[in-house]
From Swiss-Prot:
Oligomeric form and interacting partners: Part of the 50S ribosomal subunit.
GO CC annotation: ribonucleoprotein complex; ribosome
Keywords: Ribonucleoprotein, Ribosomal protein, RNA-binding, rRNA-binding
Annotated organism of origin: Moorella thermoacetica (strain ATCC 39073 / JCM 9320)
Single GO molecular function: structural constituent of ribosome
Pfam families: KOW (PF00467), ribosomal_L24 (PF17136)
Database matches in InterPro entries: KOW (IPR005824), Rib_uL2_dom2 (IPR014722), Ribosomal_uL24 (IPR003256), Ribosomal_uL24_CS (IPR005825), Ribosomal_uL24_KOW (IPR041988), Translation_prot_SH3-like_sf (IPR008991)
GO BP term, pick one: translation
Cystine pairings recorded for this chain: none
Cited function: One of two assembly initiator proteins, it binds directly to the 5'-end of the 23S rRNA, where it nucleates assembly of the 50S subunit. One of the proteins that surrounds the polypeptide exit tunnel on the outside of the subunit.
Protein name per UniProt: Large ribosomal subunit protein uL24
PANTHER family (alphabetical): MITOCHONDRIAL RIBOSOMAL PROTEIN L24 (PTHR12903)
Amino acid sequence: MATPRVHVKKGDTVMVITGKDAGKKGKVLSVEPARGRVVVEGVNIVKRHTRPTQKMPQGGIIEKEAPVASSNVMLFCNKCNRPTRIGRQILADGTKTRVCKKCGEVID
C-alpha cells in the first residue's frame, strides 16, 4: 500500500479543520509520513501516566501532544490570514516551491 503524501513540513503553521480541536492553530513539531500523521503544538493533548525513572524521578501525569491525521490540518497562509490549500510551482531558477491557492503567496 502506498504511503499518504503529507502536505506540511516541520515548522509550518497549520489550522486543525476537524475533530475536537477544530479551529486551533499551531506549529508542526514533527511529521510521520509513513503513518500520514503530524504532531501540532498545543493540539490533541493527551495525559500519560509515567513511572518514576532515573531520568525523571518525580513520575506522575504528563501532558503531551499526540499525532493527528495530516488530512485533518490545513496550512495557514499569513497573507490571507486563513487556512488554505497549496499548489506546487517551479520558479525560473528551477527550484520547487509551495504556493497559496487563494492569494498566490509563496509559502517556502
